[in-house]
């Protein structure tokens, strides 16, 4: 519940991240009907049964390391299981997007829409619409539970209607243009997270005992994912564990072909001293799908 998930706001670092941690909000967002603000970012995590909703706003929560769930305006999600072994979120109404930058076979990440469970299997970008129940795979692979222990796979650029009585067959869809606000916002968030990665990765990755996982950026004021090796997000933004990134893109729209190398927020804040002097040691590492490691020094 809210009281159990609300953590004290430290001066320099957020609490260690776990599935359900609120990573970003803009506009009107609520947890179990209580309004959220920027002080909750990184310091508030959803427990089982909690509902996060938006009005004229948006929100982003962390799932397992490397997976972000983004909640569109006028939407709501309920946390079913905030565990590393089973991470399950139900879309009550509205739309959500899920960016998967890292996933292991040991992970079991599921999105429930209209009572139907969809398991995310590969890295990529996914959207779910509870108002018109459907699962869309822009890039990646998902498996929809259709009953009797059977699953219907959804591949790149395919969607599946999730309403009862609908045809259990995926259909190809044409990726929507830049008018898709949720997609474009997710791409922008991915860009900002890549900038945060570029900003702090060198300070963390060169430290002793580095493990890939969630790491707190005190300047962007959110968690970003630092992996063991370089990778691209589904939107083409490069994440490099030793700093530096550039963009590519899958869909030829949004931010295709743009990006940065050596950009971000370097220069004005004396970051290296802030990290080490402020006790930013270790991190939210993730080992082979089994759990978090390390921790945030304070």
Model-derived regions, located:
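Low-complexity segments
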Residues: 171-277
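Bacterial N-terminal signal peptides
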Residues: 1-8
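Extracytoplasmic low-complexity, disordered linker/stalk tracts in cell-surface/secreted proteins
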Residues: 265-298
């Amino acid at each position: 519940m809210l009281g159990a998930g609300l953590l004290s706001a430290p001066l320099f670092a957020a609490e260690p991240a776990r599935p359900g941690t609120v990573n970003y909000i803009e506009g009107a967002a609520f947890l179990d009907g209580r309004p959220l603000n920027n002080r909750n970012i990184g310091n508030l995590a959803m427990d089982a049964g909690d509902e996060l909703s938006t009005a004229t706003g948006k929100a982003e929560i962390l799932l397992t390391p490397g997976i972000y769930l983004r909640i569109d305006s006028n939407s709501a999600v309920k946390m079913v299981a905030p565990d590393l072994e089973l991470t399950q979120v139900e879309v009550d109404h509205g739309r959500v997007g899920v960016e998967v930058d890292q996933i292991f076979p040991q992970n079991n990440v599921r999105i429930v829409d209209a009572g139907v469970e969809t398991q995310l299997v590969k890295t990529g970008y996914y959207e779910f619409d509870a108002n018109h129940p459907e699962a869309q795979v822009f890039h990646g692979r998902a498996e929809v539970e259709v009953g009797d222990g059977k699953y219907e796979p959804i591949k790149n650029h395919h969607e599946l209607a999730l309403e009862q009585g609908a045809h259990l067959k995926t259909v190809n869809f044409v990726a929507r243009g830049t008018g898709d606000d949720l997609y474009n916002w997710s791409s922008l968030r991915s860009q900002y997270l890549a900038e945060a990665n570029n900003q702090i990765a060198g300070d963390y990755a060169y430290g002793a005992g580095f493990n890939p996982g969630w790491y707190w950026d005190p300047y962007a004021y959110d968690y970003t994912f630092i992996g063991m090796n370089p990778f691209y997000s589904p939107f083409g933004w490069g994440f490099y564990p030793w700093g530096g990134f550039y963009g590519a893109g899958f869909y030829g729209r949004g931010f295709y072909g743009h990006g940065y190398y050596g950009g971000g927020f370097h220069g004005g804040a004396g970051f290296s001293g802030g990290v080490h002097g402020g006790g930013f040691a270790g991190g939210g590492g993730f080992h082979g799908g089994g759990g978090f490691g390390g921790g945030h020094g304070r």
